[in-house]
Amino acid sequence: MTVSTAPLLSASGLAILRGERVLFRGIGLTLQPGEAIVLRGANGAGKTTLLRMLAGLTRPEAGEIARPAAHHWIGHKEGIKPQETPRIHLALWAKAWGSSASIADILDQLALTRAADVPGRYLSAGQRRRTAFARLLLEARPLWLLDEPYTALDAAGKTMLDQVISGHLRTGGAIIASMHDAAGFPVTAEVTL
């Protein structure tokens, strides 16, 4: 990934309503290469909604988003089918993206080698979460949008993800993540909803 000085994402004046209730108004942010922004707020404050908006999955009621960088989105649902093994899951995504990344190396990096051929219905929540994050390594995209990335991860899983995140930031990538507990996360800035 080539390091650039242009923002990987910028947003201004964002507003969103849920029914008649204003979740947030006037939110703005700029994300440069190597930065990590954490979205904070109580349950129901709109963190996931804002992330989905930044990913282009929903539209704001007001405001503008410039997202010149290709991005990865990892939400609450891992997207792994019950019959799909981690190896098959990654192979399908690799084919869809035209990736030549080593699936075996990625499985090893996220401690999924022993579970590589276990159907999704039998994986633990942490194994499913790590499988979802393995997709991040299939194709280099500078911008990662992560919804509660540490959910279901034990201490070892969190350490593995921290290493993946640190490597991404070191190479000029950037991250926006919603989190309740950002301990150990390389926070550049916070947005509180």
Curated annotation (Swiss-Prot):
List the lineage, top down: Bacteria, Pseudomonadati, Pseudomonadota, Alphaproteobacteria, Hyphomonadales
Which Cys residues form disulphide pairs?
A: none
Gene3D superfamilies reported for this sequence: P-loop containing nucleotide triphosphate hydrolases
Which residues take part in binding ATP?
G41, A42, N43, G44, A45, G46, K47, T48
Read off the NCBIfam families from this record: ccmA (TIGR01189)
Role, per record: Part of the ABC transporter complex CcmAB involved in the biogenesis of c-type cytochromes; once thought to export heme, this seems not to be the case, but its exact role is uncertain. Responsible for energy coupling to the transport system.
Enzyme class, one word? translocase
Q: How does it assemble?
A: The complex is composed of two ATP-binding proteins (CcmA) and two transmembrane proteins (CcmB).
SMART domains reported in the protein's UniProt record:
AAA
Q: Which GO terms describe its molecular function?
A: ABC-type heme transporter activity; ATP binding; ATP hydrolysis activity
Q: Which GO terms describe its biological process?
A: cytochrome complex assembly
Q: Please classify the protein's predominant subcellular localization into one broad category.
A: membrane
A GO CC term assigned to this protein in UniProt: plasma membrane
The answer to whether UniProt assigns keyword Lipoprotein to this entry is: no
* Catalytic activity from the UniProt record: heme b(in) + ATP + H2O = heme b(out) + ADP + phosphate + H(+)
Q: Where in the cell is it found?
A: Cell inner membrane
Which positions fall inside the ABC transporter domain? 9-191
**Which keywords belong to this entry?**
ATP-binding, Cell inner membrane, Cell membrane, Cytochrome c-type biogenesis, Membrane, Nucleotide-binding, Translocase, Transport
Tell me the membrane topology, using the record's own terms: Peripheral membrane protein
Q: What protein does this entry describe?
A: Cytochrome c biogenesis ATP-binding export protein CcmA
What's its EC? 7.6.2.5
**Which InterPro entries does the UniProt record give?**
AAA+_ATPase, ABC_transporter-like_ATP-bd, ABC_transptr_haem_export_CcmA, P-loop_NTPase
- Pfam families, sorted: ABC_tran (PF00005)
